[in-house]
Amino acid sequence: MDLVEIFFEVVYPIFPFFHQPTFIRQVSRAEYTSERSTFSVTIALCALVSGRIRDGSVTNSKWDLEPLHKIPPEIFYNEAKKQLLNFTAESSINVLRAHAILAIAAIQNGKIRDMHQHLGAYHTLVAMDGLHDEANWPAGIGFVEREERRRLFWSIYTLDIYSSVVWGGIIRCSERQSHVSYPSEVIDDEMINDDGTTSEYPLPLETSGRRGDCWLSGWNFITDLYRVLEHALTRFRGSRRRATTNSFLVDMFEDDFTVTKSSVSESVSRMYLSLPYCFKETPPMTYNAKKDRFGYQAANITATFQLLRIVLFAASGSSIEDRCQIANQVVEAFASIPIAYLLAISTPLLHHLGGIGTILGNVLEEPLGEADYTRVRGVMLSMAQLLENLEVIHRSTSASAKIRSQVSRIDEYMHRQQHVTPPAAALGAPGAMVELSMPEGRESQNFPDIIPDISMDWILPENGELLGDLAWNFNLN
């Protein structure tokens, strides 16, 4: 029962797959012992939460975590996969939820092929019964299950777009082809039952503004951001394809490509600025589940907004200075989120940081001057510091250590170049170049301000020699 309660504390605010009172009641009555699909989804939930506990995501001191370490997450995970073999053609909500939860658990465990397998199974079952349209949902389902299905559908929609951004996969679920309403914005699950909603605010989402008293209002805004992200991502990939192929579709649908990156960015910024304050600032975690759900939305909005900025930015040509500036802003945005939320949301949130490679990756394909590499170096050190603060999530120091190792290689190369090819004007003065080693505990750049921001007489090697083996999406497991 502890694993179920922890789920509603640290996973449910991002993936509200269940109507909490209903599922708690089912588990407390041990209904999973007599209904196999309920057993499958319950074991899948245990696999995900157990993995979060293993990775240090649960920071609430009220939980006695030691007994929960006794069963490894892999035991739950493998059992859930085994149970789902009995439901290869069944699209009940529990089977769909089980695949969805195992996909998230696979991300937690660094099993990206498994993630695609479970997302693929989910999308196959949805396609078989046309569940992208509410008109095809089972007849006679109550209000509660309808709300659960809406939450599940849009949760996996966002996960599909997220996985496409982070791992470069295809988009399997298009919002344009989906006919599923957003979840009702009720303050608490206790306010809904199969007779409907008891909320005094039955406002249609299409006509109401964002509400500061309802965490699901922030959750629905995140879905809005992912819908924008889908179109931005499609446009970005389309522009790359047009650059390499002479597609007849370009001329046929030219009007589809006239929206500018800046206009989209401005529109999204206005959407963000219109949010209630509770969704724009992430307060310290209180360990009051109902209050903290607002903090989870604020943290996830920050991360998703930055991911969208990265994709929009990558779609337009920009200077190295601009790219480093936006990358620093992304790191700073993550650093503004209290650590407890980053730990709780865990590995899926951290993969957003890999998007910085979308910005900086192309930089490394160009021959760079010293000033440009200094900018890249600054971003890398900021990234290393942020990852270092979160090492507990991935149980190793590989990510931040690899970045620092690459920075050291850059420093060594630059130091050698300074002795081989000194710039004619500035470096003759004694002490013009400061010590390149990093001071203890400091993350600031160690190059002097006197380095001119112009092209130097020498360039650093192109992609491969110094930074080619840096994995921007980071192996966090």
What are these regions (language model features)?
Residues I104, Y162, R309-V311, S316, ...:
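Residue-level recognition of tetratricopeptide repeat
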Residues Q108, V166, Q306, F313-I320, ...:
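Alpha-helix C-terminal capping/termination sites
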Residues L225:
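Active-site-proximal loop/helix segment associated with metal-binding centers of metalloenzymes
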Residues N86, E90-S91, H231-R235, R241, ...:
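Fungal C-terminal regulatory tails
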Residues V41-T42, C46, N94-V95, H99, ...:
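TPR repeat positional signature
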Residues Y287-Q297, R309-L312:
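Long, well-ordered mid-to-C-terminal structural blocks that present hydrophobic/aromatic surfaces
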Residues D2-L216, E230-D255, E266-R293, Q325-L342, ...:
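Acidic, Ser/Thr-rich, low-complexity intrinsically disordered regions in fungal proteins
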Residues F23-R29, N220, Y296-A298, A303-F305:
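Short gly/pro-enriched beta-turn/loop segments at secondary-structure junctions
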